[in-house]
């Protein structure tokens, strides 16, 4: 509520979309996408992998994103065409890093679609065999660690627009790529319906993302 109130006070004509407040449509070309607590289960369990994520869209494209990890006091920021930063220092993804040398984050949540789960688990087993090791915070931290080169990549089968639109921008500005699990670019269409859409995504450097797409095919 504090974040939404602050945006309304300074940018009263901008749209706002979040899981908590829904879609506030002002017919603006600018939309703020807010995730006030990404990693809710971690937070509730006393695990320090959670944070705040805010993304600004112009029309249907993310143009600016900020992510803050309060326990670590780490701020990540990216602006379209201007790079990605952590606490003011530029970050980048090693373009030559391979899956076999990388920690890889894999995330899957509960769904009643058992076939989807089974396919995901088959992919997981292949990644275990071909990567250095598996790590997962099941939060924005997985993607931020990819952006600064700690993780080689991430596959998350259940995300919403407030989870990954800004993280995709941060990863892109750090020199990486984010695709859906079919290998296509991810497109957003700002509307209330966007809140219900699931985005299974893969992110990392181009080489690792292509390798995961082959594994998942």
Segments the model singles out, each with a brief description of its role:
Residues 19-20, 35-38, 42, 142, ...:
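Acidic active-site catalytic centers that drive phospho-/nucleotidyl reactions
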Residues 26-85:
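DPxDG-like acidic metal-binding loop motif
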Residues 77, 84-87, 106, 153:
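Short hydrophobic/aromatic-rich beta-strand segments that constitute the beta-sheet cores
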Residues 1-37, 177, 185-186, 206-217:
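N-terminal subdomain of lithium-sensitive/metallo-dependent phosphomonoesterases centered on the IMPase/IPPase/PAP
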Residues 92-217:
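An extended, acidic
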């Amino acid at each position: 509520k504090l974040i939404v109130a602050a945006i309304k006070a300074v940018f009263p004509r901008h749209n706002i979309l979040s899981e908590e407040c829904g879609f506030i449509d002002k017919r603006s070309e600018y939309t703020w996408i807010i995730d006030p607590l990404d990693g809710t289960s971690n937070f509730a369990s006393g695990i320090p992998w959670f944070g705040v994520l805010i993304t600004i869209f112009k029309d249907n494209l993310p143009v600016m994103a900020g992510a803050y990890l309060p326990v670590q006091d780490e701020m990540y920021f990216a602006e379209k065409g201007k790079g990605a930063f952590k606490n003011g220092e530029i970050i980048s993804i090693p373009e030559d890093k391979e899956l076999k040398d990388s920690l890889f984050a894999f995330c899957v949540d509960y769904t009643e679609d058992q076939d989807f789960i089974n396919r995901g688990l088959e992919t997981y087993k292949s990644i275990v065999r071909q990567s250095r090791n598996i790590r997962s915070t099941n939060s924005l931290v997985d993607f931020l660690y990819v952006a600064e080169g700690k993780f080689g990549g991430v596959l998350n089968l259940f995300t919403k627009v407030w989870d990954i639109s800004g993280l995709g921008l941060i990863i892109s500005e750090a020199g990486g790529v984010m695709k859906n699990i079919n290998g296509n670019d991810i497109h957003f269409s700002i509307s209330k319906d966007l809140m219900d859409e699931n985005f299974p995504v893969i992110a990392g450097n181009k080489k690792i993302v292509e390798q995961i797409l082959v594994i998942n095919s």
